[in-house]
């Protein structure tokens, strides 16, 4: 079945869609904490350096493969590699994207539940109450499944309407809405008493905390935050025009992703320190600590506290949804192009399969908690396999593939838009992809496995 390749209709739509794929829950619940615990501004400086030396070159590599291949991730690697075994790196990206969609939908569903709970004022109470609420909800066999199905159906609705009518159109609404919500909460948080302590925690440089662990943490964050090796960057790039400046786009997307993460810190820490709470990281920060932070910080203004809490979880849901849409598209493009079926049928396959994975992961935290593999719940197994094995392996092989096996002329033509853009930075890019990025990703991989 021959079909004309879809494409983004505008540069702003392309940037917002790809940035939406990069911006996710990790920007809110991991990056700010890492900044505060690892030297503040000192960590940010190291992180930005890692983005420049690792994140952006890896992203441009996927852009080149995706745009040149002009197909789903699996076929793009095959096209660029002339059908050689490297196409299985593309298939690894597809499989990783689909698996992440399944368990990521579980946490995304929790965000929707908290929007609902915030709207009804159900999160007002001490930390012990909120912890009990989360424990009861997350282990329930029905409610988490309902919400994960709901958010997957939202992503499905966007996907079936195509690139311009679905993904691009939705991104032009969701991403500005995310920024507006973020800025409003930042302003409200920074106006609280003792907010300056939280700002100092986030930005005051403390080079005494800098060590190997801080460097490796910044390195890993720069890799994961930009959604490298998940298939979505390569898939979205297949819809880019020949006029798109790949390096410039990667810089813009990385800037947006980093700004969201820093603003998230300005949203969380001033409020937390105003009530004397040193927030942790991960899901416990979002679902256990912050409801109580909002309750205490705005105790004298209950209506404002209700609004801020509602807006925060709506913000989280938008960030989760934009990521889910990009991950969903990875599998959808693969199925409808490889099986020669309609986009709607391809999307239906992905939605059904990821719902199945999501339901299994959700139940493994409650009713089926006894079902474990190597002492891990199914949720943790999917998280470990995709995050600590598939992603670094896929990123490493992508750099080796583009740096050493793809013809240099092809890479340079894509990098410079066939000579219409400056080639001054091309030798630097190629050096980073060939030597720096593979070593950096190996360090991330070994650090996660506690080898270094």
Regions found by a protein language model. Give the residues of each.
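Hydrophobic, membrane-embedded alpha-helices of multi-pass small-molecule transporters
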Residues: 9, 16-26, 97-101, 105, ...
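Membrane-water interface regions at transmembrane-helix termini and the short interhelical loops
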Residues: 34-38, 85-101, 135, 150-174, ...
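Hydrophobic alpha-helical segments of multi-pass membrane transport proteins
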Residues: 320-326, 347-365, 380-414
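Transmembrane helix-boundary motif of multi-pass solute transporters/channels
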Residues: 10-48, 237, 248-251, 255-258, ...
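A generic transmembrane alpha-helix motif of multi-pass inner-membrane proteins
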Residues: 377-401, 422-452
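Membrane-embedded translocation segments of transport machinery
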Residues: 2-8, 168, 172-321, 345-346
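Inter-helical loop and helix-membrane interface segments of multi-pass membrane transporters/permeases
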Residues: 2-7, 33-38, 68, 73-92, ...
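Membrane-interface "cap" regions at the ends of multi-pass membrane proteins
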Residues: 1-29, 56-63, 67-80, 84-91, ...
């Amino acid at each position: 079945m021959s079909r004309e390749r879809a494409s983004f209709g505008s540069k702003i739509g392309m940037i917002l869609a790809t940035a939406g794929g990069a911006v996710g829950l990790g920007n809110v619940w991991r990056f700010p904490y890492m900044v505060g615990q690892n030297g503040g501004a000192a960590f940010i400086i190291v992180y930005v350096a890692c983005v420049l030396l690792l994140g952006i070159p890896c992203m441009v590599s996927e852009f080149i493969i995706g745009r040149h291949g002009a197909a789903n991730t699996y076929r793009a690697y095959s096209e660029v590699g002339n059908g050689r075994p490297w196409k299985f790196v593309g298939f690894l990206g597809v499989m990783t994207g689909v698996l992440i969609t399944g368990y990521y939908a579980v946490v995304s569903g929790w965000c929707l539940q908290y929007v609902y709970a915030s709207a009804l004022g159900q999160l007002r109470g001490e930390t012990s109450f909120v912890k009990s609420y989360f424990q009861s909800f997350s282990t329930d066999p029905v409610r988490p499944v309902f919400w994960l199905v709901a958010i997957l159906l939202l992503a499905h609705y966007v996907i079936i309407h195509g690139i311009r009518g679905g993904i691009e159109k939705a991104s032009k609404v969701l991403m500005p809405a995310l920024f507006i919500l973020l800025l409003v909460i930042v302003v409200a948080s920074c106006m609280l008493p003792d907010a300056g302590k939280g700002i100092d925690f986030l930005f005051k440089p403390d080079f005494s905390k800098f060590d190997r662990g801080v460097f490796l943490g910044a390195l890993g964050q720069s890799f994961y935050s930009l959604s490298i090796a998940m298939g979505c960057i390569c898939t979205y790039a297949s819809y880019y025009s020949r006029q798109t400046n790949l390096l410039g786009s990667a810089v813009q997307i990385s800037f947006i992703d980093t700004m969201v993460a820093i603003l998230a810190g300005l949203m969380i820490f001033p409020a937390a320190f105003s009530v004397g709470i040193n927030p942790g990281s991960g899901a416990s920060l979002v679902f256990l600590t912050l409801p109580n932070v909002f309750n205490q910080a705005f105790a004298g203004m209950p209506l404002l506290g209700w609004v801020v809490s509602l807006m925060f979880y709506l913000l989280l849901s938008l960030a989760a949804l934009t990521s889910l849409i990009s991950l969903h598209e990875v599998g959808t493009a693969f199925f409808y192009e490889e099986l020669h079926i309609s986009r709607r049928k391809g999307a239906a396959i992905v939605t059904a399969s990821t719902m199945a994975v999501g339901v299994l992961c959700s139940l493994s935290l409650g009713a089926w908690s006894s079902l474990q593999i190597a002492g891990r719940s199914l949720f943790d197994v999917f998280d470990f396999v995709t995050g600590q094995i598939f992603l670094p392996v896929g990123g490493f092989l992508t750099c080796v593939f583009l740096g050493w096996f793809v013809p240099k002329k092809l890479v340079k033509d894509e990098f410079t838009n066939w000579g219409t853009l400056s080639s001054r930075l091309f030798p630097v890019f190629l050096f980073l992809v060939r030597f720096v990025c593979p070593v950096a990703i190996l360090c991330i991989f070994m650090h996660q496995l506690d080898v270094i």
